Amino acid sequence: MSTPVIKCLNVVKGYSEGPQKVEVLRGVNLQIEQGQHIAIVGASGSGKSTLLNVLGGLDKPDAGEVWVNEKAFSSLNDNKRGLVRNQELGFVYQFHHLLPEFTALENVMMPCLIAGVKKAQAKQKAEALLDKVGLSHRLDHKPAELSGGERQRVAIARALVNEPACVLMDEPTGNLDTENAESIQSLMKELSAQLQTSFIVVTHDLVLANTMNQVYRLEAGVLNKQGQ
């Protein structure tokens, strides 16, 4: 049996609101296999983004554990956690978070350079991915010179450039029109098939959610497979 790309066990996370502690995640369990696509749906404020941040090592759970390729986040220091995030995970958000002063090519190269890849190789990898997402003619354009759909495609290329085991996506089509949203969906599937990347997608878009292998619902801090 293959090793899970991401696994979490009994994850609990809460926040303080004045004198009260609000428990957002209550014993969440999840396991993602290589190449699997899952969607996480739920009402606004249900903790979907919090769960994504915990799975990506951006936030620490109050209890429970998260593993990425059998590495437990709790056993890693900050530098090693950063390496796992940079080399084994990719992140895409509703608001692309591209660096405005850099071109599309430079934005996609950035994770490679941070990982210590030589500039020439980073450039080659970034150009190849931007070509795959249909932006070979926009390499030297800065984010302000790109459309919303183009910026999101740059963000997806950036998330994939280090060939991560899993890409975590928070409302990736939330800011896009129907045509661009469908284009992003197709692109995700195509690139995943080529690279065997797993995807965890937090979304309100039920059309997007229903294209995934499995849909989970987060409600009252508890994560369940849709229909259970």
Swiss-Prot record:
It is found in: Cell inner membrane. Transmembrane segments: none annotated. It is a peripheral membrane protein. One of its GO terms (biological process) is lipoprotein localization to membrane. Residues 6-228 form the ABC transporter domain. InterPro entries: AAA+_ATPase, ABC_transporter-like_ATP-bd, ABC_transporter-like_CS, LolD_lipo_ATP-bd, MacB-like_ATP-bd, P-loop_NTPase. SMART domains: AAA (SM00382). ATP binds at residues 42-49. Its EC number is 7.6.2.-. GO terms for molecular function: ATP binding; ATP hydrolysis activity. The keyword Transmembrane does not apply. PROSITE patterns: ABC_TRANSPORTER_1 (PS00211), ABC_TRANSPORTER_2 (PS50893), LOLD (PS51244). Keywords: ATP-binding, Cell inner membrane, Cell membrane, Membrane, Nucleotide-binding, Translocase, Transport. GO terms for cellular component: plasma membrane. Part of the ABC transporter complex LolCDE involved in the translocation of mature outer membrane-directed lipoproteins, from the inner membrane to the periplasmic chaperone, LolA. Responsible for the formation of the LolA-lipoprotein complex in an ATP-dependent manner. Belongs to the ABC transporter superfamily. Lipoprotein translocase (TC 3.A.1.125) family. The complex is composed of two ATP-binding proteins (LolD) and two transmembrane proteins (LolC and LolE). This is Lipoprotein-releasing system ATP-binding protein LolD. The lineage of its organism: Bacteria, Pseudomonadati, Pseudomonadota, Gammaproteobacteria, Cellvibrionales.
